[in-house]
């Protein structure tokens, strides 16, 4: 397939032409997670003929047998999930390094067109439809993924969760005329302030945890940006299931006088929104934040996701 794919791309892209003043953005079918040789071969053979190269990465325990329940899991399972989720950064970094070798000007975009959690389908549903529930654990997969994606936007130009409605880690679940918004939906909503904004690099120092399969995860994840109106937004996740985290941020040069925000959390990691209880997990105003001169102090409750706006 590594040698066959460039030939297929070359063949079909030749017949995909621009018409009526429109320009096609041609994306080659790229690798799944750790298949770095796929990226190397495509960039070597057709890198100058494409505009983008796709990549898939799922937070999944394996492709054979049970993938685990979406709503019934242990704390150990939760931490393993976050470790697997965060490994996407290493995957993105390695694919980007290969692309840089052939395309140092970054003309070819990396397009992460499938990502998210993949659990066993909900009991009683059609297995082929991949319908799964969505808990606070899935919300953390979304927030940690966003924090990582934000760091690589010089190459990563698209990151599509799979999918939006009723499939895998979706943002919306429907049943007949009923609709429910998932915890993942609310993370998307809380992070939309970073769209069309300028990324602000963060230096983050926090405790680390060793998790299953020889992975390590930081207890706090974060990202920040400045929007076109000059407002700074900071999103943070405290992944510690049991303990709050005190976060201190140096705001030197921002002239911020106050901060407002919202928080997404729940009593249990396994909590989710159902058609019977659609508002079980949703954001509420967040007030545990103080500014003293150039120092921002935030108390993040256990298992919480927060976005604040500096004013």
What residues fall within each predicted segment?
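Noncatalytic carbohydrate-binding groove/subsite architecture in carbohydrate-active enzymes
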Residues: 2-146, 206-216
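Generic recognition of flexible, low-complexity loop/linker segments
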Residues: 41-42, 97-101, 145-149, 176, ...
């Amino acid at each position: 397939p590594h040698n066959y794919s460039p030939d297929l791309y070359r063949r079909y892209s030749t017949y995909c032409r621009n018409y009526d003043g429109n320009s096609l953005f041609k994306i080659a079918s790229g690798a799944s997670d750790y298949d770095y040789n796929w990226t190397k071969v495509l960039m070597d053979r057709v890198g100058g003929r494409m505009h983008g190269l796709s990549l898939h990465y799922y937070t999944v325990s394996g492709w054979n047998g049970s993938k685990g329940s979406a709503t019934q899991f242990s704390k150990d399972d939760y931490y393993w999930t976050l470790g697997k989720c965060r490994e996407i950064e290493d995957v993105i970094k390695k694919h980007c390094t290969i692309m840089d070798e052939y395309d140092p000007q970054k003309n070819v975009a990396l397009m992460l067109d499938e990502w998210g959690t993949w659990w066993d389908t909900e009991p009683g549903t059609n297995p082929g439809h991949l319908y799964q529930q969505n808990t606070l654990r899935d919300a953390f997969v979304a927030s940690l993924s966003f924090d990582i994606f934000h760091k690589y936007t010089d190459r990563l130009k698209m990151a599509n969760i799979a999918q939006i409605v009723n499939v895998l880690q979706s943002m919306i679940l429907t049943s007949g005329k009923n609709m429910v918004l998932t915890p993942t939906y609310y993370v998307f909503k809380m992070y939309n302030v970073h769209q069309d904004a300028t990324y602000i690099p963060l230096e983050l120092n926090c405790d680390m945890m060793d998790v299953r399969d020889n992975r390590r995860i930081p207890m706090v994840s974060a990202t920040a940006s400045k929007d076109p109106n000059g407002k700074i937004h900071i999103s943070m996740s405290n992944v510690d299931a049991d303990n709050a985290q005190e976060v201190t941020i140096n705001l030197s040069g921002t002239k911020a006088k106050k901060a407002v925000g919202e928080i997404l959390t729940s009593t249990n990691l396994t909590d989710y929104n159902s058609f019977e209880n659609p508002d079980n997990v949703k954001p509420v105003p967040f007030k545990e934040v103080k500014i003293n001169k150039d120092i921002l102090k935030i108390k993040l409750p256990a298992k919480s996701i927060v976005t604040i706006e500096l004013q």
